[in-house]
Amino acid sequence: SSTTADGAYNAGDTVVVTVTFNEDLIVTGTLQLTLETGATDAEVDYTSGTGTATLTFNYIIGTGQKSSDLDYQSTTALALNSGTIKDASGNAATLTLATPGETNSLGANKAIVVKGAYVTSVSSDSSDATYKIGDVLPITVIFDQNVTVTETPRIKLETGTTDQYATYTSGSGNDTLTFSYTVAAGDTTADLDYTSTSALELNSGTIKDAAGNAATLTLASPGALGSLGANKAIVIDGNVPTVSSVSSTTADGAYNAGDTVVVSVTFNENVIVTGTPQIDLETGSTDGTASYVSGSGSTTLLFNYLIAASHNTSDLDYLSTSALELNSGTVKDAVGNNATLTLPATGAANSLGDNKAIMIDNVVPVISFVAEGGTDGVDIDYQSSATTLAISWSGSDLVSGISKYEYALGTTSGGTEVKTWISATTDTSVSLSGLSLSDATKYYASVKATDKAGNVSAVITGDGITIDITAPTVGTVSDGMDGDISFTASSTTLYAQWTGFKDPTSGITDYEYAIGTNSGGKDTKDWTSNSMDTTVTVTSLTLTNGQTYYVSVKAKDLVGNVSNVITTNGVTADLVGPIKGTVLDGLTADGEWINADTIRASWTGFTDPLSGIKKYQYCIGKFSGASD
């Protein structure tokens, strides 16, 4: 029999079944009573009653178990299950039960119905396939009988990092309920199923059978027979293709107008492209565009960028993180998820600028100066060497930098008559040797620069340098300041002047003089610069009476050519006055008196052994030697 009231009961409810003997019995172990409950019979364990005539078995109704009039399975349904049932004397009890449905059977004594609705299967009307973000899948839950639904029950689905819910949409009053699941970004599973046997949730609603009994919501274990995973082969791909890196198959270097740079965009999965997506590139005042050319069906897409003349950048990168544009095309994965086109931040890791060192250079280099005659940037107009020549210059390039300089040498501005264009690598000076340059001829050095992108500067030519290998020609040199003199009375000073020196090329820049006691000598005064003066007064000398002194002069031109030395005919130091003679008062004889207003005098015997007598002077006084 049963102490449970007659009525209908559902899965999870407890029905107390009692077995009554004709005397008190002692029970050991766990007896079992097998009940007839449909496809799966319930085996109910002994609960209590030892020492009495009535034993109790608590039957908890299981999922899928049902019976229109609960009874045990057969007359042998009561089993010892390794236990014992004996009376006080130790006699084993007879376990044979009344025939099910007959007098004293459970079915005859009670009217207990096991009827609650339960889930028999979970499936989907969607075809076995892979589904993308935004796709809507109907999930069907099939009960063993019609059920009525209120509110919005739901099923929790196993969809990767974040589990999603399928929400009830229809089916109340039928045995099949439909739930709707919309694939969200990030959802992923290789075989869609619910999360657990308790994944079907009322969510404040109800699911009941026709009698109003709450349905059993327990589902088959995920992957087991009757589960969604076992019934269907549905793949969820909610992974959005994203850009992992931007680079280029073009070698690092500098490029200019007309060159093509191939930009590569790598995604985290294969993508399919339609149309012609584009990438906006940061290329200075005018931005460039790279257009899609190939790669559909793979992880890497290639874009061609044709460089325009207005484009310049020292490190090619795209314009911004949103520089990749569909341009009316599409970029999707195999199931149709639209790719996220966000690029790494410009200059950051995995950006084009970070991965590559590509310069776009359409700015020609600039040569700022060309100097002939020196390697240090100093420009000269003349030089005395006809076999060597130094050239120096300066240049710059604002974008890619100078790759090489070239120079040429000619007899005309920009000409190459002497040296055709020769590479100087990146040096900014060169020293030429082994030349055969012509005297009084002007030579012009020209320089041009090529940057790393191949842009060539304008040719810049120096102002020229003239070869001067001819010394100045000499003129004449005279002793004295006013015509040529042969004697001097000064013991400390000599004078000289010269004229007629010439240099037709670089011009005279300095005169030097020397003084010696022989022609061309310098024993009295060593060679001394007189700048451009053509007269000289030399003081602080110590001249010797009777010694002849010679002044020598030479000229130097701008490049250092020195003329021949030309020397005066000499000037003799006459430091001693003439030897005195005799002076007479009178013209013929020496007188003592005169009686007139005229005085006459005469002299004789005056001599000078060096320069000779030039003139006589006289004076008159009231006493000897006076001039009053």
PLM feature segments, named:
Residues 12-14, 134-136, 258-260, 383-390, ...:
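Short coil/turn motif common to extracellular beta-sandwich-like domains
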Residues 387-398, 492-504, 597-609:
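Conserved aromatic anchor
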Residues 401-405, 507-511, 612-616:
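Solvent-exposed loop segments of extracellular immunoglobulin-like
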Residues 426-433, 532-539:
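Short S/T/G- and acidic-enriched coil/turn segments that sit immediately N-terminal to beta-strands
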Residues 454-467, 559-575:
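Extracellular fibronectin type III
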